[in-house]
Structure formats: C-alpha cells, structure tokens
C-alpha cells in the first residue's frame, strides 16, 4: 500500500522542504515549477477535498488558502508532525491511498502530489476503484506526480541521473513504482473516469480525472 517507503520519508521529513525548493541538486528537475504544480492541483479541485500524502503540508496550505475544506491523509508520523506545526487545527489522519479512516464529510475532490507512485500498478487500480466510490457525482481526482510516456523514457531518465552522478535519484526511479501514462489512463477509464494529462516538467504530469456516471 506504499507503506514500504515510510522509513525513507521519516528520514527525509526534516529536509523535504529544502528538496522542493531546489536546494537538493539531485531533485531540482523533479521539483521544477513546484509552485505551479501545486497551483494547478488547487485550481482544478473543488470545495471538499481529500488529500493523500500530505507530507509537510505544502499543497494543504494552498488548498486552505483557496477556501477549500481539507481532510488530509499521511502515513508518515514525522511528516504529519511537521504539517500540523505549519497548519494548526487541520485534520491530518494516519492512513494511505487504500486504507484510511471513515470520512466525516462528502468528498468532491481527491488530490495528491508526489505520492501516487508509491503504489504498484495493481494497488493504483484498487485505489482508483475506491476513488470512484468515495467521490460525489462529477467529482475530480487531481494528482501531480512523476510518470513517463514510455518505458524507454523512464530508462532514459535513470541513465541520465547515473551519468550526472545522481545516485540517489537513479535508485529512487528504479525502486519506486513510477508508472507509464497509458497504464494510469487505462485504470481510470476502467472505473468510469474521463482523464487527461498535462506535463509540468521532465518528470511530473498533472492527472485530471472526472468521475462520470
């Protein structure tokens, strides 16, 4: 369910905000246009939001500033603690994309950034099925995450990272479950979503999926 990577995020939590602001050279291109990525997710979401993978609360803060009501889900204790310090009073629950507490309000948007790739392709499909069950009619799933158009494109980025001496990035791309866009598209369409993709940098795409009937 993506929880096999929790230890990585427990260690990364104190430095995560440095990474997203470009202070970590290995991840500079991954987080390129970070503010625009967050803004794109906020602008395409509706009013009652369920956010998976809250992390240190950067997207959550923008959602709240836009006047949205947010329930956050985050499996990392260290990340939750940082987010709660940033955003006192916000509801951030222990959980993941598949296992999370019973919700206390109707949900018309499910959002996430830099987290969906922690699920295997099979788990992604299971999560998408649950998204359809949770969302109100015409609700939206809006994710920003690393994915690739082809397996070759993914391998090219791994090879480039190694050539640049970015060992941690190369190992990250090999270890975690960064998907191919066609696989994600097929999963959303299987569960009756209309889905589109928008590229934001060399790694990250925005997924916008609207629940149909």
Swiss-Prot record:
One of its GO terms (molecular function) is S-adenosylmethionine-dependent methyltransferase activity. It is an enzyme of class 2 (transferase). Keywords: Methyltransferase, S-adenosyl-L-methionine, Transferase. One of its GO terms (biological process) is methylation. Its EC number is 2.1.1.-. HAMAP family: Methyltr_YrrT. PANTHER family: TRANS-ACONITATE 2-METHYLTRANSFERASE-RELATED. This is Uncharacterized methyltransferase OB1106.
């Amino acid at each position: 369910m993506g929880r096999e990577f929790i230890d990585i995020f427990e260690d990364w939590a104190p430095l995560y905000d440095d990474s997203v602001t470009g202070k970590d050279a290995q991840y500079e291109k991954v987080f390129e246009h970070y503010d625009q990525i967050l803004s794109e997710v906020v602008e395409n979401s509706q009013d009652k939001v369920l956010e998976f993978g809250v992390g240190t609360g950067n997207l959550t803060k923008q959602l709240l500033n836009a006047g949205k009501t947010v329930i956050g889900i985050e499996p990392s204790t260290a990340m939750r603690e940082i987010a709660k310090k940033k955003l006192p009073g916000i509801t951030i629950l222990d959980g993941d994309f598949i296992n999370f507490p019973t919700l206390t309000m109707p949900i018309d948007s499910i959002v996430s950034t830099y987290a969906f790739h922690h699920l295997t392709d099979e788990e992604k499909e299971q999560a998408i099925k649950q998204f359809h069950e949770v969302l109100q009619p015409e609700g939206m799933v809006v994710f920003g995450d690393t994915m690739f158009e082809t397996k070759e494109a993914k391998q090219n980025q791994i090879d480039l990272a190694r050539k640049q001496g970015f060992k941690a990035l190369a190992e990250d791309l090999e270890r975690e479950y960064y998907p191919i866009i066609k696989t994600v598209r097929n999963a959303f369409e299987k569960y009756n979503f209309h889905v589109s993709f928008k590229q934001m940098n060399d790694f990250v795409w925005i997924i916008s999926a609207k629940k149909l009937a």
